[in-house]
C-alpha cells in the first residue's frame, strides 16, 4: 500500500479574520463542564412557562377561550 507524506509547510493555514479573533475567547471553554446541575432548573421552568404560553395561544386560536371584545374570523 502506498503512503504519501505531506510537509507541514504545504498545508494551507486558516485565514485569520477580525470576527474570528473576537469569537476565539468564547470557544476557549469548549469541553469544560461545570459540576452540578447549573442552570438546569431555570431552563425547566422556562420550558414549562413556554409550554403553557403555547397552549393558551392554541386555545385562543381554536376558540376554546372566548375573549370579550376581541373579534376573530
Curated annotation (Swiss-Prot):
Highest taxon, organism lineage: Eukaryota
Disordered: region residues: 1-23
Transmembrane segments: 41-61
Modified residues (Phosphothreonine): 3, 5
GO BP: any one term: photosynthesis
Subunit comment: PSII is composed of 1 copy each of membrane proteins PsbA, PsbB, PsbC, PsbD, PsbE, PsbF, PsbH, PsbI, PsbJ, PsbK, PsbL, PsbM, PsbT, PsbX, PsbY, PsbZ, Psb30/Ycf12, at least 3 peripheral proteins of the oxygen-evolving complex and a large number of cofactors. It forms dimeric complexes. Detected in both etioplasts and green leaves; PSII is only assembled in green leaves.
Free-text function comment from the UniProt entry: One of the components of the core complex of photosystem II (PSII), required for its stability and/or assembly. PSII is a light-driven water:plastoquinone oxidoreductase that uses light energy to abstract electrons from H(2)O, generating O(2) and a proton gradient subsequently used for ATP formation. It consists of a core antenna complex that captures photons, and an electron transfer chain that converts photonic excitation into a charge separation.
Post-translational events: Phosphorylation is a light-dependent reaction catalyzed by a membrane-bound kinase; phosphorylation occurs on Thr residue(s) in the N-terminus of the protein.
Any Gene Ontology CC annotation: chloroplast thylakoid membrane
Family the entry assigns: Belongs to the PsbH family.
Membrane topology: Single-pass membrane protein
Protein name, entry field: Photosystem II reaction center protein H
InterPro entries, sorted: PSII_PsbH, PSII_PsbH_sf
MF terms in GO: phosphate ion binding
Subcellular location: Plastid, Chloroplast thylakoid membrane
Key words, A-Z: Chloroplast, Membrane, Phosphoprotein, Photosynthesis, Photosystem II, Plastid, Thylakoid, Transmembrane, Transmembrane helix
Amino acid at each position: 500500500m502506498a503512503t504519501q507524506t505531506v510537509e507541514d509547510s504545504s498545508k494551507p493555514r486558516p485565514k485569520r479574520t477580525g470576527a474570528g479573533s473576537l469569537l476565539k475567547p468564547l470557544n476557549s471553554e469548549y469541553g469544560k463542564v461545570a459540576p452540578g446541575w447549573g442552570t438546569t432548573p431555570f431552563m425547566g421552568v422556562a420550558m414549562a412557562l413556554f409550554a403553557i404560553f403555547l397552549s393558551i395561544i392554541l386555545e385562543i386560536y381554536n376558540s376554546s377561550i372566548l375573549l370579550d371584545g376581541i373579534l376573530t374570523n
